[in-house]
Structure formats: C-alpha cells, structure tokens
C-alpha cells in the first residue's frame, strides 16, 4: 500500500500557518513504534527498519505529498487570555488520506523552532514523549477519544529543562489538530471572516453531512458541545486528570490531546491536582467538567459574529444534561446496573464518600466490585475498608439494588470487568519506564505499552498492584 497525503490545511487556509521543515536531532534513532496503529494506517514496515535511520520519524525526510507547516492559534491559559501561541515545537507534516475516505494528521512533536516558539527551543524531551505515547495509547485502549502515538525517536541532542535531558520526537496521529484556540486567535485579531472560514473548513472535512444545511453552524456547535461534554464524562469515569485544560489544548472534535502533566487517580480524592504548576487547583480532577463548559463559552464568544447569541446559549445550556446523562450511563455500567432507578446516584455518591474518607484506590475498588454476588452478604471488597460498618451499610443498599436486576451474577460481573479496567497508566509506572529509557534500556517502555493495550484483562503483576507510597498523587511538571 502506498501512503497518500493531502494538503487541505496548506492549500485551503493560507494565513493560518507558516510553512517550514522539521529540524533534525543529532544522531536520532527510533526506539519505539506502534505496530498496531502502523498496520491500521498501512505504514510499510520498511519505514521502521534500523537501516533506514530516523527518517520521517526524526524529521530527516518527508514522504511524498507532505507539506509541513506550523499552525497558529491563541488561547486562555489558567483562565487568563494568553494571546498568540501556536505550534511552538510541533509541525503538521501532512494529512494522510485513508482508504475509508477519512484523513488523519501526522504531527511531529519536538520538530524544532517555529515562528510560534516564543521563548522555547522547539524541542521535546524523551520524558515527555514517552509520557504522551503511553497515555494516548492507554486512553485509546480504554475507549476514550484521543490522539494516538505512532513513534518515538531519541537522540544525542541535549535539551535544557529543570535539568539537561535527551531531545526526542514523537509522531502524533489525530483526526484533526484544530483547537478552540484556533478560533479565538482570529476572533481577538478582529478577523471574523477567518473565524467563519475555519468553521467552514472543519464542517466540510469533519461534519460534511451539514455542509449545505442552512443551520450548519448551529448544528456544528451543538455537536462540539455534546462531544466535549461526553469527553468530560469519560475522563471522570476512568479517573483521568488532564492537568492543563487551557483552551489551546481543547480539541474541536472532542479528542483528548496535549498530554502533559496528566494523572490517573490512585486514591480517590476528588480534589486531586496532577499539575504542580496549578497552584489554585483550577484543573483539579473534580473541576474538569466545569472547565470544559467554561472553555466552550470562550469558543462560543469567538463564534458570535456569525452564530446568534441565543443559539449559542441554547447549545451551551445542553452541556450539563449531556454530561450527566453520559456520566450516569457510564457509572451505572461500572456499578453493574443494567437498568436505571431514581436512587442510583445516591448509591454512587455514598460509595464515593466512603472511598474519599478512606483514600480507597479508585481503579481497584471498581474492579473488585465486579466480584459481587447479589445473593451473598460477603464481599471481597470489604477487606479494603477500615470502616467495616460504613462499608456494610453501603453494601447492603447496593446488594438490594442488584437483586432488582434480572442479569445473572456471571453475566453482570463479565460486563463489569469489560468496563472497569484492571490496569490504568499510573504515574509511577510511567516514571519507571522513563527512568530506564533515559539510561538506554527501552524494554520496560515496550512491556508497559504491551500491557496497556489490554487494560481489562486480569493480571497478577505490579501493573495492577497498589502504587508504592512514593508513587501516590504524583504532581507532574508542565515542561516537555
């Protein structure tokens, strides 16, 4: 199969980017590639052979049809208008045309200086590229909309962060890299015609069913609201904290993008802050749904020159309903409830209150809940709690609720095990792989990637054990 690339952004949106080539690293070498994703994309195995060098993965060559460019956008960061931002370290190499008619972006992170690098050096480090590759593939395996990682290249280039680190590149694959901040950029530059031009572009390429509809802009924004609300519900369900939900990190397609100081919950603490630069807790785990709406409000403001304010507000008013409907559906599945009753939220909230008081492990608690037998008063989860009386009280209510379900125990438990992962990407697991990779040993990186592909499978290794004390509630740097 020959890879085919289009250049829609390059050809249709002049003034939205700067064309430039990647800047290769010193002695770049491929250390990991995503064979499964490569197969899905039809990427020839020969491109990953050691004798071919870093090639396109290290920005040393381009594939036919690629027109590399850096996109310009702006955004609100931590609630404050930050002005022009843009691709400061990444370059959109091209858009691959797939056999099903869709396209995907090939975006090279760490590709060197661009006009939008500001005070940065245009580079990424091995630590951050490993973290993004692990997180994006973990989220994909959990069924959450996300960008993907295709390859990692390391090098002898030294990059200054808190300390000197190895320069690296990551090939990111996504349906689109359009962010809320793309629209904000031209709105604040008082160029509403370009905001509309970009809206027309994304509708044509990602919502073609509405391209000729008189209400296409309203229908499109309504769907952006719904996708964002659904994504927030997914994050909350699996215990994922993004850490830096600036408007320039919000995907117009409702994808999880820009993995930086993220973290999955260990102990259930709703105020968990994974980003050590988030001093006020703006992007804490429990605040994410509210921030999602705030970011949509900023997007709506940017679209107000050509969408009526009333229509924008009507769409925004649907956010909470979509969020709670999707979240409720997902959490009922985690509880093994196939039907819906009025008191289901009370059961869930009582469990969360108990978990929060005890610092119960979020992932392990729900996984073990899948071993419940509705006609047995015993639960293997009981030994996980110090407050046995509190657990017994909650479990009696939960078991009574299960008894009103017709689904047999074995079928319900199998269903629960298909939605409650045995394994998530805990920060300490990622850090262990990073530490070894920085010493030139990539075996753990490969092992961890392999394990993350099947998060719902039972395991008996430390990938599913409680984190060590040093690994709990890790806060991570924004630096990449």
Curated annotation (Swiss-Prot):
The keyword Transferase applies. It comes from the Bacteria. Its EC number is 2.7.7.-, 2.7.7.108. ATP binds at residues 86, 88-89, 109, 121-122, 172, 179, 258. Keywords: ATP-binding, Magnesium, Manganese, Metal-binding, Nucleotide-binding, Nucleotidyltransferase, Transferase. It is an enzyme of class 2 (transferase). Mg(2+) binds at residues 249, 258. Its cofactor is Mg(2+); Mn(2+). The active site is at residue 248. InterPro entries: adnlytase_SelO (IPR054838), SelO (IPR003846). It catalyses: L-seryl-[protein] + ATP = 3-O-(5'-adenylyl)-L-seryl-[protein] + diphosphate; L-threonyl-[protein] + ATP = 3-O-(5'-adenylyl)-L-threonyl-[protein] + diphosphate; L-tyrosyl-[protein] + ATP = O-(5'-adenylyl)-L-tyrosyl-[protein] + diphosphate; L-histidyl-[protein] + UTP = N(tele)-(5'-uridylyl)-L-histidyl-[protein] + diphosphate. Nucleotidyltransferase involved in the post-translational modification of proteins. It can catalyze the addition of adenosine monophosphate (AMP) or uridine monophosphate (UMP) to a protein, resulting in modifications known as AMPylation and UMPylation. NCBIfam families: adnlytase_SelO, PRK00029.1. Belongs to the SELO family. This is Protein nucleotidyltransferase YdiU. It comes from Enterobacter sp. (strain 638). The gene is ydiU.
């Amino acid at each position: 199969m020959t890879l085919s690339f289009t250049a829609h952004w390059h050809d249709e949106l002049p003034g939205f980017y700067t064309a430039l080539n990647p800047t290769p690293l010193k002695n770049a070498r491929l250390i990991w590639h995503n064979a499964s994703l490569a197969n899905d994309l039809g990427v020839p195995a020969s491109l990953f052979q050691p004798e071919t060098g870093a090639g396109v993965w290290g920005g040393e060559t381009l594939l036919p049809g690629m027109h590399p460019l850096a996109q310009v956008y702006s955004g609100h960061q931590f609630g404050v208008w930050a002005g022009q931002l843009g691709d400061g370290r990444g370059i959109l190499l091209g858009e691959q045309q797939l056999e099903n008619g869709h396209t995907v972006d090939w975006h090279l992170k760490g590709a060197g200086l661009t006009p939008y690098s500001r005070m940065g050096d245009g580079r990424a480090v091995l630590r951050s590229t490993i973290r993004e590759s692990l997180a994006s593939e973990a989220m994909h395996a959990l069924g959450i909309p996300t960008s993907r990682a295709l390859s990692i290249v390391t090098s002898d280039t030294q990059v200054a962060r808190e300390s000197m680190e190895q320069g690296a590149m990551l090939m990111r694959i996504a349906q689109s890299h359009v962010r809320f901040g793309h629209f904000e950029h031209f709105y604040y530059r008082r160029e509403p015609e370009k905001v509309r031009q970009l809206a027309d572009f994304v509708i044509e390429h990602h919502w073609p069913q509405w391209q000729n509809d008189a209400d296409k802009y309203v229908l499109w924004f309504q769907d952006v609201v719904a996708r964002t609300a659904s994504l927030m519900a997914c994050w909350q369900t699996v215990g994922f904290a993004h850490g830096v939900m600036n408007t320039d990190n919000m995907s117009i397609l409702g994808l999880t993008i820009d993995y930086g100081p993220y973290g999955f919950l260990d102990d259930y603490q709703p105020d968990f802050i994974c980003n050590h630069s988030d001093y006020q807790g703006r992007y804490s785990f429990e605040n994410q749904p509210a921030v999602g709406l705030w970011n949509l409000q900023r997007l709506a403001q940017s679209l107000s020159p050509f969408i009526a304010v009333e229509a924008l507000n009507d769409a925004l008013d649907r956010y909470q309903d979509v969020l709670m409907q999707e979240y409720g559906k997902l959490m009922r599945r985690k509880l093994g409830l196939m039907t819906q009753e009025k008191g289901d939220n009370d059961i869930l909230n009582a469990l969360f209150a108990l978990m929060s008081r005890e610092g119960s492990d979020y992932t392990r608690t729900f996984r073990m809940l899948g071993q419940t037998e509705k006609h047995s008063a015993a639960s293997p989860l009981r030994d996980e709690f110090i407050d046995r009386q509190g657990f017994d009280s909650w479990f009696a209510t939960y078991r009574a609720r299960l008894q009103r379900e017709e689904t047999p125990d074995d079928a319900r438990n199998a269903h629960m095990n298909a939605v409650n992962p045995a394994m998530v990407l805990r920060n300490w697991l990622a850090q262990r792989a990073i530490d070894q990779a920085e010493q030139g040993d990539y075996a753990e990186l490969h092992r961890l990637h392999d394990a993350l592909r099947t998060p719902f499978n039972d395991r008996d290794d430390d990938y599913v054990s409680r984190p060590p004390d040093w690994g709990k509630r890790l806060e991570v740097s924004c630096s990449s």
